[in-house]
From Swiss-Prot:
This is Glutamate--tRNA ligase. It is found in: Cytoplasm. The gene is gltX. It comes from Methanocorpusculum labreanum (strain ATCC 43576 / DSM 4855 / Z). One of its GO terms (molecular function) is ATP binding. NCBIfam families: gltX_arch, PRK04156.1.
Amino acid sequence: MADADIRNDIYVLALENAVKHKAVPRAGAILGSVMGAHPELRSKAKEINALIPEILEEVAALSIEEREEKLMSLNPGAIEKMHEKKERSHELPDLPNAESGVVMRFAPNPSGPLHLGHARASVLNDYYVKKYGGKFYYRVEDTDPKRVDPSAYEMVSEDLAWLGIGITDVVYQSDRFAIYYEYARKLLELGGAYMCTCDNNEFREKKLKKIACPCREISVEENLKRFDDMLAGKYAEGEITLRVKTDIAHPDPAVRDFAAMRVLTSTPHPRKPAIFVYPLMNFSVAVDDHLLGMTHVIRGKDHIANTRRQEYIYNYFGWKMPYFYHYGRMSIAGLELSTSGMRKGINEGLYTGWDDIHLGTLRALARRGIQPEAVRAATIDIGMGDTDISFSWENLFAQNKAVIDAGADRYFFVPDAVEVEIAGAPKTEAHAPVYPNQPERGERVLPFTGRVLLPKSEMEKGGMLRLKDLFNINITGPNSAEYAGDSLAEARSQKAAIVQWLPTETAAPCSLLTPEGIQEGFSEPAVLGYLGRIVQFERVGFSKIDAVNDGKVIAYFTHR
């Protein structure tokens, strides 16, 4: 095997390792890979080991994007294998008793738009309906008017459509009050519930002491009279509650004689303003899950206590329970997820709206350039395990990159730019591909006439810089430099940073909005024509062009 071939193999193996792990590998790891791939070279291990540090320096000098581009040109099969491995991971375990089809539901409260936590519930249920066939209900759980934002009805529907959720039926619980009253009456007749007129605080104290409420022992006839009086408006808010009889000594106090229906007059319902008797979640959910024929319910383990409550209702009516699966909690660092917290921040001007990039809503992710396919893939990768986990932004970004990379044309963005005059350089122009290794997509031509825009942070370092796709310069002052030849090999030997640059005459002002703040700078003028599309700013990352105002680009940073 020739020395040049050995060096090329080492370079490719180093690139594969760096792309896979998003970091420059250790020399020992590369030596082991070389020996594993070419056992006949073990006698040359010493010479090969001496080559590795120099090659790793070359790999380290490349950006993440450049490493992938190099690897794609040298060994496209390696990238394909990485993607195949990801695809194989996008599977979930089989559900029991699902072979003949399933009936499942996504049932949010319309208090605001959907966020990443909602995405998990909707995607997991949608996955199984698409796998087995059947019905998928979008059930709007809007029986608590205090938690209903009228604008959320439309926002949630839009979010589900964006996410590609295959809803087959839509049900509004606020259209079903008569059904809940009917089953509340039946439950009273069965002796499975009672109408409690005790003070709520007194009831809570008794419950914690495992002492039954006196109302628990009243007759069915008296319960039905109180129920009719409640529906007739003879009780004020807080004066009466329908409670389900459970075990007053149950180990979980939340399960003991839980509330199922109440009077609420202080907040009118936006869809049903005449209603004042409202079922609580556990009652309406149990009734609807049965009547709509749910076969499987997949939700977070914070609902385990609710499942225990609902089981009492199922048992009183003699209904068959669905199969319940409770997945672990998922913490999401770095973004606001609380609907009340988001609304407060919007009202106070802290956030620009529900799609502010500091929020974890799906519409905020979409505005940044995150694709629904990536959210789905990342969610399925997380799976349904009952162990609590932390959401992986790295995985979401990797999934998103796999979706957007092929369509993202490459351009320069110069942050915090300074104008630099370069002495001694020939008047020339740079030719850069719109997309690596695809000449049919065209090229960008950047003319050089003596003055360029460069990142201030790079100018402050001094020394030699390599202007990408152009030539080398030596920095001579805050706004000056001199031509230092065209040799890329010389730039590498001097460990010169490869930097993006722009001609001063044609650069377009550009604001790049990131979660950390706004980066002011300049982009290539062609970016003005990419409104609503995603580009990759070389050595910066993917960005979605959000607006173009009077020749200025407003872009949202997606990820690297």
